[in-house]
Amino acid sequence: MVRQYKIHTNLDGTDDKVWDVTNGKVRFYQPSNLGLQSTNNIWQSNGIGVMGTRSITQPQIEFKLETFGESLEENYQLMKDFVNDILSKKFVTLEYQTEIFQVYADLALADVTKTEGYGKNGTFSEKITFDIITKWYTYENLTFDKIQNGKVIAGMSKIYGGTAPGNYKYIKGTSYTYYGESDIDRLSRWDIKEEIFSFMGILYPKLPKTPAGVRFLDDIGNEYTAIVFKTEQVQDYILINTDVNDETYQGWKGTTALNLFPVMDFERYRTRIIEKGQMELINLSKAEFKIKRKADFV
């Protein structure tokens, strides 16, 4: 596979429009700089240096842009639609894929030329430049189901057997459930092995008038942040997005959306950066996540 580029108008949304700028009728060529710039604070005296902090910045990306319409009219329309789609959004997302990785960058339009340099059938050959918001990150889809009491989960569940109370022993290799477990929530935790800088989630609450959401624990089991809501009516689902540029906290009941920001437990929401540790569901039957992990250089 050669390098593939796509532009997403709303990567986290259901109305995402995708422009295939590798194989479509609007194409990108010759990126100016997909790398990074590093500024190092170094103190030197007589040739002896002391290394201070390092600041990483992401330079603008410039592409050569060409249209491949079959007529002058179509090429004008392609150019107009593409630029207007980008301008209609606060930012767009560049998908960059090769045989060995797939990463994303959030971009804001900085400059696009219009030199009217026609080619065959009135094709355009221009330059387009983007400012960098976030570059690069991976984007993963994850689904979590809460463990239920009495539910058999192959390879995970265990059974303790015996003939008298207080004399139960674990039977190795048997996949059964923790039937009768009084604290089933303690089994519904998932490991987080790498830092997550933002995520979008769809949460499915169970009980009304009971806090619902997710909480995050550090390596030693202490809660350091949580996104929890308390509503009078149980919501069909809760939509959250912790991206600072696209933040959302919405409850949905049928076709009615409710802003849940006022009913968030702010004392527990201490940071949007998710560290290595564990995640736990609170009063949820299921949760679906799209998570973003930072990768400065690929």
Swiss-Prot record:
The GO annotation for biological process reads: symbiont genome ejection through host cell envelope, long flexible tail mechanism
Q: What is its main location?
A: virion
Report the subcellular localization: Virion
Entry GO terms, CC = virus tail
Q: Which Pfam families does the protein's record reference? A: Dit_C, Dit_N
In the UniProt record, does the keyword Glycosyltransferase occur?
Answer: no
Q: Per its UniProt record, what InterPro entries does this chain match?
A: Dit_C, Dit_N
Q: How does it assemble?
A: Homohexamer. Interacts with the receptor binding protein.
What role is this protein assigned?
Forms the distal part of the tail. Self-associates as two rings organized back to back, with a central channel allowing DNA ejection.
Entry's family note: Belongs to the skunalikevirus distal tail protein family.
- Protein's name according to its UniProt entry: Distal tail protein
Q: Which organism is it from?
A: Lactococcus phage p2
